[in-house]
From Swiss-Prot:
Organism: Mycolicibacterium paratuberculosis (strain ATCC BAA-968 / K-10)
Family: Belongs to the class-II aminoacyl-tRNA synthetase family. ProS type 1 subfamily.
Reactions catalysed, as given in the entry: tRNA(Pro) + L-proline + ATP = L-prolyl-tRNA(Pro) + AMP + diphosphate
Signal peptide: none
Protein name: Proline--tRNA ligase
Pfam families: HGTP_anticodon, tRNA-synt_2b, tRNA_edit
NCBIfam families in UniProt: PRK09194.1 (NF006625), proS_fam_II (TIGR00409)
GO molecular function terms noted in the UniProt entry: aminoacyl-tRNA deacylase activity; ATP binding; proline-tRNA ligase activity
E.C. number: 6.1.1.15
HAMAP family found in the cross-reference section: Pro_tRNA_synth_type1 (MF_01569)
SUPFAM superfamilies, sorted: Class II aaRS ABD-related (SSF52954), Class II aaRS and biotin synthetases (SSF55681), YbaK/ProRS associated domain (SSF55826)
Length: 582
C-alpha cells in the first residue's frame, strides 16, 4: 500500500505542547499521532491508529497461539454483577457511574471479571467443556484523579483482558504460565525492555500476581531487584527481611524522660545525644507512631496506629496496598482534639492499648528490640521500651518505604530500585469470582466442581507510549519495524520531474513487493521533509535527492542511525526490501 503525504490527514508541530511533560507525550502530539480532547481523553489520528492496530495484531496472534478465543463485551455495564462481588463499592470514585432514564445504575467498565464469569457459567455445565480461555481487546474507563503523561495515564484506554477457566488449580497454573510466556513473546516482538516483578492483587483479588514493568525514568511504579539473585518486586509487594527476635531478659527497664519540645524525630534524636544515655542515638533507634482513620467499604471510620522505625517514612503505595480495599486518611488537628489521649508528637504504645486503638508495627519491630518513643504526655518520651516485654502490637504491616541497600527478601544481597511503567498484570484469581456467582460445573465423578479462574491484562494503547518512551532520540520517534505505521518513508527531495517520476515508480515497485510506503510527495522544501521524516519515526527512510542524476538513492536506518547509498535500477526495490528484512 502507498500513502501519499499530500493526501494524508496529518499536521506536524515544531514545538512541544505546553502541558506535555514526558517525551512520548511531546512526540506523539508533535508528530500528529494523537490529539487531546479533554483531560485524560485523546483522539487517535491516522498514524497513531496504524501503530495501535499493529500492536493489537501482535497481541491477537500471541493470544490465539495459546488457545485464546476473542469475544467482545459492552463497555456499559449494569450494577448488579459488581454488587455481587462488592466491587461496586470497592472501586469508590475510580469508576464512571451513570443512570439510564429509568434510574437504573450502570458503570463504564474498568475490567470485566464479572461478565466473563457469568457468561461462562451460562454457556457451559460440564468438566468436559474445560479449559476455556477467552479474551477481548476493548476500551476501558477509569476516573483518574490526575490524568498525566499523555496516553500513559488516561481515563479511556485500550486494554487486552483475558480470562482462563479451569476445573482445578493445576489447570489454572498452566494457563497462568502460558500467559506469562505469551506476554514475553509479545514484548520481544514489540522490542520493549521490561522486568517481571512480584505484585499485589488489590481489588482484583486472588493469590499469585505478577506485573510486567517497562523500565523507564518516567514510570510511576517503583520496583526493586536483587542483582545477585534476580529477585524483583513492585515496592507494594516487597516483604521486609524480618530480624530474629532477641531475648528480653537482662535488658534495662524503660525510663520516662522529660525531653522538652521534641515533637519530631530530628528533635528527639538531638535531645537523646545530649542526654548522656551512654550511646550514640540515630533515628533508627526511635519508634514513631503514625495515626490514621481507616474505613472498610460500607463501614465506619476507625482509628489505626502504625509503628515504624523513626528513620523510615510511610510509603503511601505500600500502605494503600496493605489496607486494600479500605480507604484511609491521616488524622488532622480536629481529630487530635477529638481524642485527647493522642498527644501529637509524643504518642506511645501504652495510650493506644489503653484506649483500644488497633496497633500494627513494621516487621523490624520484633520482640527484644529496644526503642525510644512517646510517653503519651507533652514533652516526655520513654527510653528503652522493649517490644514483647513492655508492649505488644496487634500485628505487622508492610507500610514503610523500601530503600536501596535494604536486604533482599531471599537473603541473596541488597536491593536496588528503579522506575517502570506497568504494561501488563497477571493474576491467579482462584475462586473469588466463581464463588460470588456459584459458577459450578458437573465434575467427572458427577459432583459439582467450582471453576477456578485467572485474569490477564495488557495495556494496548499504553504500549504505544511505552515504545515511544523507549525508542526515540533528539530528532523524534524511532518505531521498531513490527509496529511502525509504514515500512518505508520515501522522501522526494528533488524537484526534477524525472526524479519525482522515478520515486513514484519506486513506490509502486515496493508496493508490489508487499512493502508499505509513506510517499512524501508534498510541495515542501527538503529540510521540512527531512525533519518530518525524522519526527515521524518510520524505521527506514529512502531519499530520492540530488544523487538520482548520478544513479543513487540514500537508504537511512532511522533505528540504527546509519545511512548508505543504493544504486538505482531494476533491482532497487528488491535491494530495499532485502535491507528491511535484514
Amino acid at each position: 500500500m502507498i500513502t501519499r503525504m499530500s493526501q494524508l490527514f496529518l499536521r506536524t508541530l515544531r514545538d512541544d505542547p505546553a502541558d506535555a511533560e514526558v517525551p512520548s507525550h511531546k512526540l506523539l502530539i508533535r508528530a500528529g499521532y494523537i490529539r487531546p480532547v479533554a483531560p485524560g481523553l485523546y483522539s487517535w489520528l491516522p498514524l497513531g491508529l496504524r501503530v495501535l492496530r499493529r500492536i493489537e495484531h501482535i497481541v491477537r496472534e500471541e493470544m490465539n497461539a495459546i488457545g485464546g478465543q476473542e469475544i467482545l463485551f459492552p463497555a456499559l455495564l449494569p450494577r448488579a454483577p459488581y454488587e455481587a462481588t462488592n466491587r461496586w463499592t470497592e472501586y469508590g470514585d475510580s469508576v464512571f457511574r451513570l443512570q439510564d432514564r429509568r434510574g437504573n445504575d450502570y458503570l463504564l467498565g474498568p475490567t470485566h471479571e464479572e461478565l466473563f464469569t457469568l457468561t461462562v457459567k451460562g454457556e457451559y455445565s460440564s468438566y468436559k467443556d474445560f479449559p476455556v480461555l477467552l479474551y477481548q481487546i476493548q476500551n476501558k474507563y477509569r476516573d483518574e484523579a490526575r490524568p498525566r503523561a499523555g496516553i500513559l495515564r488516561v481515563r479511556e484506554f485500550v486494554m487486552k483482558d483475558s480470562y482462563s477457566f479451569d476445573i482445578d488449580d493445576a489447570g489454572l497454573k498452566a494457563a497462568y504460565h502460558a500467559h506469562r510466556e505469551a506476554y514475553q513473546r509479545i514484548f520481544a516482538r514489540l522490542q520493549v525492555r521490561y522486568v517481571i516483578v512480584s505484585a499485589v492483587s488489590g481489588a482484583m483479588g486472588g493469590s499469585a500476581s505478577e506485573e510486567f514493568l517497562a523500565e523507564s525514568p518516567v514510570g510511576e511504579d517503583t520496583f526493586v531487584r536483587c542483582l545477585e539473585s534476580g529477585y524483583a518486586a513492585n515496592v507494594e509487594a516487597v516483604i521486609t527481611a524480618r530480624p530474629d527476635p532477641q531475648p528480653v531478659e537482662g535488658l534495662p527497664e524503660a525510663v520516662v524522660h522529660d525531653t522538652g519540645d521534641t515533637p519530631t524525630i530530628a528533635t528527639l534524636v538531638d535531645w537523646a545525644n545530649r542526654a548522656g544515655l551512654g550511646r550514640a542515638v540515630t533515628a533508627a533507634d526511635t519508634l514513631k507512631n503514625v495515626l490514621l482513620k481507616v474505613r472498610q467499604p460500607g463501614g465506619d471510620w476507625e482509628l489505626l496506629a502504625i509503628g515504624l522505625p523513626g528513620d523510615r517514612e510511610v510509603d503511601d503505595k505500600r500502605l494503600g496496598a496493605a489496607l486494600e480495599p479500605a480507604e484511609y486518611v491521616l488524622l488532622d488537628d480536629a481529630d487530635f482534639a477529638r481524642y485527647p489521649f493522642l498527644v501529637k508528637g509524643y504518642i506511645g504504645p501504652k495510650a493506644l492499648k489503653d484506649n483500644g486503638v488497633r496497633y500494627l508495627v513494621d516487621p523490624r519491630v520484633v520482640d527484644g528490640t529496644s526503642w525510644i518513643t512517646g510517653a503519651d504526655e507533652p514533652g516526655r518520651h520513654v527510653v528503652g521500651l522493649v517490644a514483647g516485654r513492655d508492649f505488644t502490637a496487634d500485628g505487622t504491616i508492610e507500610a514503610a518505604e523500601v530503600r536501596d541497600g535494604d536486604p533482599s527478601p531471599d537473603g541473596a544481597g541488597p536491593l536496588v530500585s528503579a522506575r517502570g511503567i506497568e504494561v501488563a498484570h497477571i493474576f491467579q484469581l482462584g475462586r473469588k469470582y466463581t464463588d460470588a456467582f456459584t459458577a459450578d460445573v458437573l465434575g467427572e465423578d458427577g459432583k459439582p466442581v467450582r471453576l477456578t479462574m485467572g485474569s490477564y491484562g495488557l495495556g494496548v494503547s499504553r504500549m504505544v507510549a511505552v515504545i515511544a518512551e523507549q525508542h526515540h532520540d533528539e530528532l523524534g520517534l524511532r518505531w521498531p519495524a513490527s509496529v511502525a505505521p509504514f515500512d518505508v518513508h520515501l522522501v522526494i527531495a528533488n524537484k526534477d520531474a524525472q526524479a519525482r517520476a522515478g520515486a513514484t515508480a519506486l513506490a509502486d515497485d515496493l508496493d508490489r513487493l508487499g512493502v508499505e510506503v509513506l510517499l512524501d510527495d508534498r510541495q515542501a522544501s527538503p529540510g521540512v521533509k527531512f525533519k518530518d521524516a525524522e519526527l515521524l519515526g518510520v524505521p527506514w527512510i529512502v531519499v530520492v535527492g540530488r544523487g538520482w542524476a548520478d544513479g543513487v538513492v540514500e537508504l537511512r536506518d532511522r533505528f540504527a542511525g546509519q545511512t548508505r547509498e543504493l544504486a538505482t535500477g531494476p533491482s532497487l526495490a528488491a535491494d530495499i526490501a532485502a535491507a528491511l528484512r535484514g
